[in-house]
Amino acid sequence: MSRIYNFCAGPAMLPAAVMQKAQQELLDWNGLGVSVMEISHRSKEFIALAEQAEVNLRQLMNIPNHYHVLFMHGGGRSQFSNVVNNFLGDHGRALYLVSGQWSQSAVEEAQKLAGEAQIDALNIVTKADGLNQVTLPDLHSIKKDYRYVHYCTNETVDGIEIFDELDSPWPIVADLSSTIMSREIDVSRYGLIYAGAQKNIGPSGLSIVIVRDDMLKLASLPQSSVMDYRIAAENGSMFNTPPTFAWYLAAEVFNWLKGLGGVEVIAQVNQQKAQLLYACIDDNSFYRNGVAKQNRSQMNVTFQLADDSLDSRFLAEAERAGLVALKGHRIVGGMRASLYNAMPLEGVQALVTFMSEFATKHS
């Protein structure tokens, strides 16, 4: 069977080496004669796996000791609710920066739970020369008392990524679902980081929360115990049965990334992949991208064909060439190539070759 390159935005492709290892030990993990899916999450074997996974994640992201690492149920949307329920209380206020579809969804969930009076939303995307660009606001000039400011580092639907560090007088809560471990960040700048697993960490059903100790101590009491970050921290993320197979695969992805040389190394590969694809788009009038260069996403490259009547043919021929899941999100249309950590450089090279040949054939 010829190689298939999966450009899905999420659930996304996993590293081939991780999938092969999971396949090999699916029925007999760690010499136990049973699958890792079948053992107790409180067994000494699984607890050892969980503890090592946290150690590896801390090393990969250089997470300071005064931060808690939580492995929680659900994806990024579940944390939209959890953040509000843990930190706003009855009278707290929060500021949400809106840069695209996902940050807007976070606003809507927060306003649904806390009410519009407690949630301020600030759009930070403008157009210049027909291109979307992000302008980070001067938050120190805003004379309000917020519990936190929330933003999303990468908008997977819109193809917009924020590379500049946010400077804030209030704790920063960041949705890193699609950029976590794709490039180096300074974790100490954040009060809380959350990320759904299904892009750069593992399969869906798991989310990672990295929360600073002082924020955890100031948290209000959510109505639901399974949403309570403090309870999760006090119980090693095992207050209730966790998604053990997703946790296991995340642990294997951490091992894989460490074996490559860590985030510093994969960041260079990711930059190379994105530059290669954007160069193909920019060098050919057959394709176009609508994002200013300084905010073009490295993880989710969105583009349109000059003649959108060819969209269906492009997708069909790409699939026959082993390049799948390139259809853009239904809200924006066009095409989208997701280049998460597991996407090899060879996959992007194959896509660029196909795009060049398709443009030549249909120009």
Curated annotation (Swiss-Prot):
Q: Which EC number(s) does the record attach to this protein?
A: 2.6.1.52
Disulfide cysteine pairs (residue numbers): none
- Can you cite an annotated GO cellular component? cytoplasm
* Listed cofactors: pyridoxal 5'-phosphate
What's a single GO BP term from this record? pyridoxine biosynthetic process
Give the cofactor note text. Answer: Binds 1 pyridoxal phosphate per subunit.
List UniProt keywords, sorted A-Z: Amino-acid biosynthesis, Aminotransferase, Cytoplasm, Pyridoxal phosphate, Pyridoxine biosynthesis, Serine biosynthesis, Transferase
Instruction: Say yes or no: keyword Transferase present.
Output: yes
Record's family?
Belongs to the class-V pyridoxal-phosphate-dependent aminotransferase family. SerC subfamily.
Q: What does this protein do?
A: Catalyzes the reversible conversion of 3-phosphohydroxypyruvate to phosphoserine and of 3-hydroxy-2-oxo-4-phosphonooxybutanoate to phosphohydroxythreonine.
Protein name stated in the entry: Phosphoserine aminotransferase
Q: Which organism is it from?
A: Shewanella denitrificans (strain OS217 / ATCC BAA-1090 / DSM 15013)
Q: Which gene encodes it?
A: serC
